[in-house]
């Protein structure tokens, strides 16, 4: 089966950390025996404008055609202003690039479109699906519902596109509840699988140093420039640990390849997550698979699998520091296993069932 993946974010040649959760999904579809091609519309911008957000790094000079993991990628440009004050401009621009997409695909015609994120790329997915009379699926990872629905400029467009999709996939139950509250009936939950390669997989390790006298390597698994990641709270937590005698070193992640990310998870003592907004943070699960315990505020779906002593309900440095010390005291000899719903095999079966059901309905 030929499947076209449309996404606002996808790894670029100069920013391979961008949109890895989408390339993971492309890998799942490929493993099912489907032929996959990717459309990654990019906003027109100058080099200096990339500094607005880490996910924009590499966008200005990105090639129009490239390959990532043996998957062909086409990156047409569209017009869009920061904050989308004129959404109609973005909509018209997104619809216009359907011609260049059709030309790039040539004789290759998809039988299904999988669109990651709704605004604004679902405008393109919806137009192409109508043009070829095929079903399309929208995958919501969080931003569309958590931020987009609160924005008066985009909320109506997001709801309209979500209801026009043949199926909505959310990556967490919380997002599915939002979809239900908005009157979206054709939705289901498929988690993002944990894609750590076997070479990096190990059991969580126990702390063996001198209590409150040794160096602690804390991993903050995000780019500190992203405000929703709440880097300041992580720094406050580390300061609190230092007042207790710990010598704290903090490592952050800035667009590193996944293998380097996993290497850093292997050597860290604790991974600290302080985000204000998450749907299903991959880094928490990846860290656990790489053998590094995780302390996190209760955000996204981390409460589904993290032990209670690893979770902090309040965004307070002292309580996060207490949780880190509890994690260091814990005996991890018995290991740690994630729920089956985050495994590659489970997610693969869910996508197989979804695709089969869609084909039966059309």
Predicted features along the sequence, with ranges:
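Conserved donor-binding/catalytic core segment of Leloir-type glycosyltransferases
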Residues: 4, 209-229, 235-238
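Short hydrophobic beta-strand element within catalytic cores of glycosyltransferases
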Residues: 293-296
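Acidic anion/phosphate-binding donor-loop and adjacent secondary structure
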Residues: 149-152, 180, 195-213
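N-terminal subdomain of nucleotide-sugar transferases
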Residues: 1-61
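Aromatic "clamp/platform" in nucleotide-sugar-dependent glycosyltransferases that forms part
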Residues: 276
